[in-house]
């Protein structure tokens, strides 16, 4: 729940009027059905976000009441004067008031236009980056220095409300997603989103774009054209939308400060959105899994995970994505184009973002600092991993059975087992479950548990995502590249694990010997070394092992199966690692060199074993007779003397 301080942060200084936009009846009539629904959703979300931060110290505006009742918002008028509520500063022409239907000839003042622009500004509003922003973007075209006039539909000039007055009929429907459009050309442009087609190519650098206006805007980067100038700072900009942001530099307009952390903002809407971070309020909860979100757009994006909807598909590998931006980022992995080159070392990158991260290696810049201990890191990823070392585990305990959980979501799901609240029933066997996620998980029992089969090798999986990961083994594609060393990986999780090796951070330490590890799984695997237990015994020779994986590897020795064959000489090997080491013999690659005598080895383990000759160290001792040996293989051969084990029998007597 939000603290009192976080509520006081904006209470008394921020009102709903600061971030709202109103429409009169004639303005409302100019919007089509889609824009009306969009406006209603935006205003309701704006109010809910404001309440989440401020709390109960603001009253519900009449506009919100009308929108919740799905009534027309222009009905919120002052009955005494017959004029709209004075929420936006506007000048009215009294002679043009129609007493019959209260339609006004409304002339927007500069202040009202600024209010409209500020609320729907691309950088100032928390809903501006969502999928609906481009639909509403046409409202900003009505801005003017002198003001613009919007009259009723009978007396409006053809050009005045051109961006607002759209035909309510939308006969052209997209077959992919069902979205409708008023013009065929608009539909054609939209369809390129699904096809991924980019017919407009830049002759300078070869970069392709979906729309001609995107190409035109991009070409200004090469020409250096900046037609929109700012007088006060004598700065020039390539796009008119960028013109208004530097004005805040000269006016000192960062008037809205957060009382929690002191961060300042140019707009109230940005402050309200930032306040949600301190408030820790997540009003949007998923009915499927119980996960909660602070923002509506994050909630909508999350729901596509459960529905399986991935409308944006890659033409090269067939992989689907929920968001277009993810597809665009993924497509760069297929192209070998790397236009961004480091001036220091000449290394090239696909995106400017990756180049900036790489340049921090040369500059030594570490902008991400830990608030607890002051340690600095080059990447946000390294800081996030480091901060986990300071976090204490906080468990939420069930009052009924005492079971503990890390997250409130998991505890809430668990409590349903005690209340017997299981609304989701299986139609095949009648079993009931507290949520749809567990029901879907149960349904795999009826489909032999693994409904997703690989067409290449026939292997089955319980989840589609696991099948997709597995299929990358057959394709051989490794789209995820490490920025530090250039190594490629099949999966993003493998890349993340690998990147930790560059940071040098090993937060998981063994309490027995002090050895540190990158991952908790590596620490758990290491702990077996300190135990004397060897629970996994070979039924053929009686040899015991600490790990089951070692027993499986050992079993291949008795089976005599050598499934890994060298393509150079035809020699077979039981283990893949043995084949990998053997291949270095053909390549004459011996990277591990002894500093004492200069002898080189294919494998690091061979070098370590060789170095014991110079040191005279014999760490492997026989427990029965006390004999010591340089390597474990010599000890194993010696132990057969005491056990009298004779593994190899002559077939011909």
From Swiss-Prot:
InterPro entries xref list: KRAB, KRAB_dom_sf, Znf_C2H2_sf, Znf_C2H2_type
A molecular function (GO) term: DNA binding
PROSITE patterns: KRAB, ZINC_FINGER_C2H2_1, ZINC_FINGER_C2H2_2
Tissue: Expressed predominantly in the testis (at protein level).
Membrane-traversing stretches: none
Entries under CDD domains matching the protein: KRAB_A-box
Residues of the KRAB domain: 14-86
GO biological process terms on file: regulation of DNA-templated transcription
Keyword annotations of the record: DNA-binding, Metal-binding, Nucleus, Repeat, Zinc, Zinc-finger
Zinc finger regions, C2H2-type: 172-194, 200-222, 256-278, 284-306, 312-334, 340-362, 368-390, 396-418, 424-446, 452-474, 480-502, 508-530, 536-558, 564-586, 592-614, 620-642
Location in the cell: Nucleus
Gene3D superfamilies named in the record: 6.10.140.140, Classic Zinc Finger
Annotated Gene Ontology cellular component terms: male germ cell nucleus
Domain of life of the native organism: Eukaryota
Described function: May have a role during differentiation processes.
Family affiliation: Belongs to the krueppel C2H2-type zinc-finger protein family.
This protein's name: Zinc finger protein 59
The species this protein was found in: Mus musculus (Mouse)
